[in-house]
Amino acid sequence: MANKRNYAKELNTLIETFTHEEKRPTLLLHACCAPCSSAVLEKLTAHFKITVLFYNPNIYPEAEYQKREAELKRLISEMPCTKEVALVDLPYVPEEFFTAVRGLEHIPEGGERCFACYKLRMEAAAKYAAGHHFDFFTTTLSISPLKNAQKLNEIGEALAEEYGVPHLPSDFKKQEGYKRSIQLSADYNLYRQDFCGCVFSKKEREAKAHLSLIHISEPTRLQLIS
């Protein structure tokens, strides 16, 4: 069995190489939300000239999309390390998400539906990066403990082959990246959503919350009966 790749270590090795060669490559960074972007931007801005791409047609409803978009803009405007960071905001077209996941609607969170969503958003990043001559592209998604870093990197590498722009390997949750994102979210008073983004994850989250309420209330009901 092949050894599991350490994407965080691969990224650190690349950064060391760029530092030694006194290079600061351009990077198109797909961002899913402000909390996930915070620690990633803090880690990368010293080593890359970053443009953030906000393309997330999966987010539901539109008010949620607008809230996450506004928080990302605020974060970029307030973090000291992001003074040179640009933001590209692609149109919000939810139909693109529903087309990408058609037939996968009933698959549980974390499965093939999510992988199709990863690809949709990362492909938009790869296309934009190729069209605007970036040195690399990647996504903030791997900072979440709920996101499959191996799958994200596999998708990124396949898209790199297809579009001719290198994918920057990453597993941003490693080396306490996720923990740092929580701290930065508190420091900047960021809105931290309680579901991934799509209508399916929202419904799944609400169903789990409902079951939790039932379990909590059951002892109370039994006490009343006795």
PLM region spans:
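Single conserved hydrophobic/aromatic residue that forms the stacking wall/gate
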Residues: 214-226
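Nucleotide-activated chemistry modules centered on ATP-dependent adenylation/adenylyltransferase
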Residues: 1-39, 47-217
